Amino acid sequence: MRLLILILLSVLVLFQHDFWFGSNGFLDYRQNAEKIKENQAENEKLSQRNQRINAEIQGLTKGFEAIEERARMQHGLVKENEVFYHIVKESK
């Protein structure tokens, strides 16, 4: 009877060891869950960035005003017979 109890306890210990420390065990599960959370956060950032870029693309393809604004701001372009004033804030 003692031998049977000893064998059952050793089998239980082996199963517990595999559960906690084995491949695909509890510790691996926790690490993978953390990686999933990090990846989901990164995906959310990228999704928001994609939405901003998509909105910018839609603005550029649909409206002339967006193209004109971009040309003025990024390239300093002005219309014919137009005076452009660039006001620079004084640094302290």
Swiss-Prot record:
Keyword Coiled coil: yes
InterPro entries in the cross-refs: Cell_div_FtsB, FtsL/DivIC
Keywords: Cell cycle, Cell division, Cell inner membrane, Cell membrane, Coiled coil, Membrane, Transmembrane, Transmembrane helix
GO biological process, one term: FtsZ-dependent cytokinesis
Residue ranges of coiled coil: 28-63
Cytoplasmic face residues: 1-3
Entry keyword Cell cycle: yes
Signal peptide from the UniProt entry: none
Stretches of the chain found on the membrane's Periplasmic side: 22-92
Membrane-spanning parts: 4-21
Membrane topology per record: Single-pass type II membrane protein
UniProt subcellular location: Cell inner membrane
A Pfam short name: DivIC
GO CC entries: cell division site; cell septum; plasma membrane
Protein purpose: Essential cell division protein. May link together the upstream cell division proteins, which are predominantly cytoplasmic, with the downstream cell division proteins, which are predominantly periplasmic.
PANTHER family registered for this protein in UniProt: CELL DIVISION PROTEIN FTSB
Similarity section: Belongs to the FtsB family.
The protein's assembly and partners: Part of a complex composed of FtsB, FtsL and FtsQ.
Name of this protein: Cell division protein FtsB
Name of encoding gene: ftsB
